[in-house]
Amino acid sequence: MAPILDDSIALEKKQEIQKKFGGVFQGLWFEEEICFAIAGGGCKAFYGLGFGHEMKSWGLKFREVSGVSAGAAMVLCLICGDEEECVSFFENIVRKNPANFYLSRLFKGERVFPHEEMYRKTIRFGMDFQKIVKSGIKVFIHTLKAIPKEDSLRNKFRLARLIAETAKAFLEDERDKKRGLNTGRMQRVLRKWNMKEVLFTEKDFDDEKAVEQIILNSSSVPPVVSVQSHGNEYYFDGGLTNNLLLEVFPPDKKTIGVYYEPTTIVGKDPKLLERCYLQTPSEPLPITSFDYTDPNGVRRAYELGKRDARLNKDKIFEYLKKDWAKAAFFLKSK
């Protein structure tokens, strides 16, 4: 006599077969290996982490990734596969942090901003060096390296003044971009710094400390995150010149990018933007870049990223259709 199968067992087997068949079918019609970029933005980058996490659950694989500032930490977190744990860890340390600025520390000679220490702790918690190396995924992290031309800038007071001037120029340029005006302040300041763009890749990941330092190099936003320096070289947030690194990916590969502000893509090549799928939050993000006191905002930004990915799943898969599949659909519809 044939064994009697419980209905639930039969249903599970059917679903398993459908899932396997669906995976094969998906691989035939869609590009499953993609390039993925997350813009910098401090806590806002948790939105990008949530978006990437949701796409991974569909079976999409990252062939190449790029990140700037906090976006760099997020793309590496996606490679390590511990997104949920990292969000929970950061929520917990943020919950214990009552303020973004501690004046009392100033008189003790300590850092008045808690951000850098909390940032480093989260990076150390979430980074699995062996997973990153063994993944085979190409990684690009954008930063700025400066070697001041003027010897006088070795004076700490003058160096601090130039740092303040850099921050002011960036904020004023962002304001003008929102108004649709041409900007040039940052370029003038960068010339004083003798600044050039630097791309770190997975080939620069010698060990865990190197990975951590590269992320910090890309995230240097004084005074919140101190200027990272090595000898006479200074590193600044890569977002000062390019906060969404799309240009490094092969033009024939499907590329998805996440950013948060309209000014991020101002000045980018229109042809580059046309061949990418770009995503911004569907509603105002519930947290600001440097608010390290709001665990609920962190979680909500992450969950909004996941939700927006789900809401746009059909659009994303339409973008990921292979060229022959699009052609077949076009011929069928004629």
State where each predicted segment sits.
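Patatin-like phospholipase
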Residues: 1-65, 77-334
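Gly/Ala-rich beta-loop-alpha elbow adjacent to hydrolase catalytic centers
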Residues: 67, 71
